[in-house]
Regions:
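Polytopic endomembrane small-metabolite transporters, centered on the Drug/Metabolite Transporter
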Residues: 1-316
């Protein structure tokens, strides 16, 4: 009886998804991604800084292991339609996986030396890079004047906000800037793989996890993270274990929702959602984890997002 009800539930969800029109699907996916991503930076900050557990390669390795194990269990139980991993699929998706690995690691490093509001400000440069890549790599039409100006003003807001950061850390800002380039690259490649090769989100997520797991594990051992973790007192700290487990689980779900948003909507839309999310993140960041000292430029920069983002929504 339980299996029958579960099957009927999955069938109902699949039927609902098939009947939803293009704009309806896009709205659902965008909302899901927004919901998943809103808390991730705070979880990262809690684990990396508050608990002094700054081992980004180990953290990403754990997320990839959980993703691979869960998806393979679902595949074996035939709960999802998913082909087994193959070397050919891995090689085909390797450029995207390398960009993903670079972005994930650099983001965690940047967060360790940068407060959350300023990290969000730097990430607002991603739509500009996505806009350029959509023309160069995806061969899309040149953006309209309204769209181009919207993205340009958002990027300018990020630069203005950075001028008000009294705790400027060149290394952290460099890592944040490089993570922007890497994120724009892998989102664009996910969109291209979905459009040209018709790969499902779950397939791309599965292959990506297999591809990046050896990278994260190897680098983690090279930089000596296992030995440092063995001497770390973080695991014994009150509340660390559930927060760390939540970070790993949320990271897996976030990656899935992000891949799905890039495939169903677009890479540019995905990065614009991240920008919208960063407004809330910036406000909350002033009051959490030490926040950042108030400066008019810190408010002026993020406020640039409102009108340009509304213009983008009207166009899509």
């Amino acid at each position: 009886m339980g299996g029958c009800c579960a099957g009927q539930g999955r069938g109902s969800m699949q039927l609902f998804w098939k009947k939803a029109d293009g704009s309806g699907k896009a709205a659902l996916v965008a909302g899901f991604y927004f919901t998943c991503s809103i808390s991730m930076n705070f979880l990262n900050k809690a684990v990396v800084s508050s608990y002094e557990f700054n081992y980004p390669f180990f953290i990403m390795s754990c997320q990839m292991v959980v993703t691979v194990v869960v998806l393979d269990i679902f595949r074996i139980l035939k709960l999802i339609k998913l082909p087994a991993y193959s070397l050919k699929d891995g090689v085909d998706f390797l450029p995207c996986s390398l960009s993903f690995a670079l972005h994930s690691t650099l983001s965690l490093i940047a967060l360790h030396g940068m407060n959350i509001p300023m990290y969000g400000a730097i990430k607002r440069c991603t739509p500009l890079v996505n806009l350029i890549l959509s023309v160069v790599l995806l061969k899309k039409a040149f953006p309209s004047v309204l769209l181009g100006s919207s993205v340009g003003v958002i990027t300018m807001g990020a630069l203005v906000a950075s001028l008000g950061d009294f705790q400027f850390d060149l290394h952290a800002y460099t890592m944040g800037g490089l993570s922007v380039l890497a994120q724009a690259a892998y989102l664009t490649l996910v969109q291209r793989t979905s459009e040209l090769h018709h790969r499902s989100t779950v397939e791309m997520l599965h292959v990506n996890s297999f591809n990046t797991l050896p990278i994260f594990l190897t680098v983690s051992m090279v930089v000596g993270e296992p030995a440092k973790i063995g001497m770390s007192l973080a695991a014994a700290a009150p509340g660390f274990t559930p927060v760390f487990a939540l970070l790993i689980f949320s990271g897996c779900v976030l990656t899935w929702s992000q891949f799905m948003c890039a495939a169903v909507c677009s890479a540019l839309t995905t990065s614009m959602i991240s920008v919208a999310k960063s407004v809330i993140q910036t406000v909350l960041g002033f009051f959490t984890f030490g926040g950042v000292k108030f400066h008019p430029l810190n408010i002026t920069g993020p406020s640039h997002i409102l009108n340009p983002h509304s213009s983008y929504i009207l166009q899509v």
